[in-house]
Amino acid sequence: MDELLSYSDIISIHVPGVPNGESLINIKELNLLKSECFVINLSRGGVVNERDLFNFLVLNQNIQFALDVFENEPYSGDLLNFKNITFTPHIGTYTKESKNLMEMEAVKNLINYINS
């Protein structure tokens, strides 16, 4: 992963949550990024350590981030002060199909509870 981080111009992160609440991207990994890298996190909150990201961006204003997920949502932390971060809502489940499936699953669970 070190090589990927140090050579890539654009990095898009799509991983499941990290076990034990450990972050995948911490200050060590952030310091490997190219000076004008663009990083997109579309995976899970906590994959990028937000405190380390804040400390890193104070000194590295050329690196761009796009964040779709956060450790705590809705996000209201200090990262909002950076102009080199784009924030988007995590709306991956807001398609008609996925909402319909979630609603059907909720109804099934309710029926199973009532019948048990």
What kind of feature is each model-predicted range?
Residues 1-78:
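Rossmann-like adenosine-cofactor binding region
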